[in-house]
């Protein structure tokens, strides 16, 4: 395992591992992705994303975890993706997204949470996503009254909203 620390991808900007059978992404901790901007882990069997707090993806702009088995995103509070612009967590089994209140992705422009089990979206009253332009929440179990209030809050800030 110590040899893995020496592996560096000095120029790699995009890593796509879509449509595999990956369940454990802990190995990402051992690689140095100095210029990685896009990481695509769609359509796998990932349930634990805790390792994301240990990786150093200082240039990461796009992270897609669509269609996995993720139910817990509390690690996002500790993640240091200062340049992250797009986060896709759609197609998982998320129900509680209240941690988003504590997440500090200052550059986030697109957030996709579609195809989950989300009921309560009042957390968006408290989020700090000042640059958010697109929010995908379709195919969840949203409460209509809370949704109506959210739309009023987001109307002027977000360019595209899907439900």
How does the language model describe each region?
Residues 1, 117, 141-145:
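Intrinsically disordered low-complexity regions specifically enriched for long asparagine
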Residues 1-4, 22, 46, 161:
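Generic low-polarity alpha-helical segments
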Residues 2-9, 26-33, 50-57, 73-81, ...:
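A structural signal for leucine-rich repeat
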Residues 9-14, 19, 43, 142, ...:
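Positively charged, low-complexity intrinsically disordered regions
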Residues 13-17, 36-41, 60-65, 84-89, ...:
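Conserved hydrophobic beta-strand positions in leucine-rich repeat
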